[in-house]
Amino acid sequence: MEEPGATPQPYLGLVLEELRRVVAALPESMRPDENPYGFPSELVVCAAVIGFFVVLLFLWRSFRSVRSRLYVGREQKLGATLSGLIEEKCKLLEKFSLIQKEYEGYEVESSLEDASFEKAAAEEARSLEATCEKLNRSNSELEDEILCLEKDLKEEKSKHSQQDELMADISKSIQSLEDESKSLKSQIAEAKIICKTFKMSEERRAIAIKDALNENSQLQTSHKQLFQQEAEVWKGEVSELNKQKITFEDSKVHAEQVLNDKENHIKTLTGHLPMMKDQAAVLEEDTTDDDNLELEVNSQWENGANLDDPLKGALKKLIHAAKLNVSLKSLEGERNHIIIQLSEVDKTKEELTEHIKNLQTQQESLQSENIYFESENQKLQQKLKIMTEFYQEDEMKLYRKLTVEENYRIEEEEKLSKVEEKLSRATEQLETYRKLAKDLEEELERTVHFYQKQVISYEKRGHDNWLAARTAERNLSDLRKENAHNKQKLTETELKFELLEKDPNALDVSNTAFGREHAPNGPAPLGQRSSETRAFLSPQTLLEDPLGLSPVLPEGGGRGPRGPGNPLDHQITNERGEPSCDRLTDPHRAPSDTGSLSSPVEQDCKMMFPPPGQSYPDSALPPQREDRFYSNSERLSGSAEPRSFKMTSLDKMDGSMPSEMESSRNDAKDDLGNLNVPDSSLPAENEATGPGFIPPPLAPVRGPLFPVDTRGPFMRRGPPFPPPPPGTMFGASRGYFPPRDFPGPPHAPFAMRNIYPPRGLPPYFHPRPGFYPNPAF
């Protein structure tokens, strides 16, 4: 407190010394009296200087106060946002402290169970502390940025005042330019009206010319089409007539050839007729001497005379002559028919020649008409040329007038373009300044939103850590239940061993429902009911499922050593302390005192288990039993009551399961696939295989494993996290952390106290990495 009071003393001494020097330097006429108004001169000068400085300070302070009133609204908003951020920061710190306390309590409880869990919790606590430190650093950076932005806003507001003055000057120039543009627009409108009148007259003339050209073209096309159609028709008819003429000529030539052949044939026949007549006369003379000839023939028949040959030849000749007469008559008829056809062909030929002459006359008339139309077309084309020349002269006159008007209009448009450029520049400057102001406001809003999102993300992480702690606690409680259930199974097996010691036939009675063929006394009768074979069981076991026998059945009458109740911590042994794998791998071992129901070789053949890490085939799957789930309030009914254990998934308890938990479940399947662990499906296998059942060798397992899901064809482990514990597990109420409806997909919880390595969160990508500090998570 003494230092600020001691600092102004040397400054006052220096001021007084300078004042004395100034007074000493003044002339005697200018020096004041030694005691004006009863005060020394030094005090008066000091008071005047101090008053001058006070007035300057007052003016500067008033200017600052007047200037600061303009920013009161902005400062209030920024103060509200800063207060909200500070409150959220305080809440986060409180939540972080509570979470740290919960983690510390949880670590104290879990340190007795496993040392690996403590390391994971310590690493997570360190990561949370590092994130808190990063949050504090980011908050300090935010405050520095807010101060810089306030300075920028002040500078921009001073620029805005200058821009307003420029806008006033620009508006005045704009008004003067608008007046000039209105006068120019009126002149342009008058010029456009004149141009429109010229265009209307040009359009009318062009329409008349087009109509005349269209009519001429239509007449020409119609004339050509008619001429072409008629010419095509006549060409087709002429071609058909030529074809008919050619066919008739060919038929005429063929008929003439046939006639010549027939005439030659007739001549040959007429030459043979006199010969035939002479032969006929000779035959008549021979008929008179038939009687004599008969005697001669009879006399010469035996001698083999050849008198029959000339008679047969004469008969053949007569028959041939008759046939020739018939053919001659037919040839004459054909000849007459061909002559008639030739006469008809001559008539058609004459008609065709007349028709061709008519066509030639029509063609000459059409050619004369075509010449007339061509002359008319030439006259019309000459008229069109004259009209086009007249219209071209008018167009040249109008074009000259339009060029003069267009030049005047271009000059006016250039003036207007210059004015518009000035206006556009002014508007662009205004827009740039407005954009700068908007960008600064948006950057402020983005900074606020960015840090709000960071706060929300840290709240989410805290909530997810809290959920992970709950799931870990539930996992512990479920493991305790499983251990209790396994202890109950041990007590049941001990009771069964006692029953077997008292009555060795009780084993056959309990397993007749599944393995009657393997019994030593042969299969049971078909009419015997399953309830009769369960006479030695307790009434509690008869109410529910049949008793699940232990994985290894006793061979002798003594009791085996009792180990710990958890089957996961030791390898299952038989009654004599030998592991079950010895029985499977030693097929030549002698049977026990009581005797097994089947030989070891048969047991090996019946029990074909796949190697570790592979699944059962579909045909070799053991019968499955329905799994059950016990609630937190459910108790075990008795020592001999078998129950199977099943864990519900997080999908039913806490909503949809995140993708990371599904991947961790798949990793759990891969990691635990090489281990053969007894589960709730083993009793069902024992019941199904009968008293001679021997399980496969089991490898020693260390570490916590999860219950097996036997509903599918492949044996799978349950989810890595059991259902969450009650809300009051860590001392805080369940409503302390209210559920939040965060946008987007749900975040995966931290893998707290899990057998799998923790997975890092993805980095947060900022929308504008060039402006804000780059946060490192």
From Swiss-Prot:
Region (Disordered): 541-671, 721-742
Cited InterPro entries: cTAGE_MIA/OTOR
Keywords, alphabetical: Coiled coil, Membrane, Transmembrane, Transmembrane helix
Family of this protein: Belongs to the cTAGE family.
Membrane-spanning parts: 39-59
Coiled-coil ranges from the UniProt annotation: 118-269, 339-498
GO cellular component: endoplasmic reticulum exit site; endoplasmic reticulum membrane
The protein, known as: cTAGE family member 6
Principal localisation: membrane
Entry-linked PANTHER family: CTAGE FAMILY MEMBER 15-RELATED, MELANOMA INHIBITORY ACTIVITY-RELATED
GO biological process, one term: protein secretion
Biased amino acid composition, Basic and acidic residues: 572-591, 662-671
Top-rank taxon, per record: Eukaryota
Membrane topology qualifier: Single-pass membrane protein
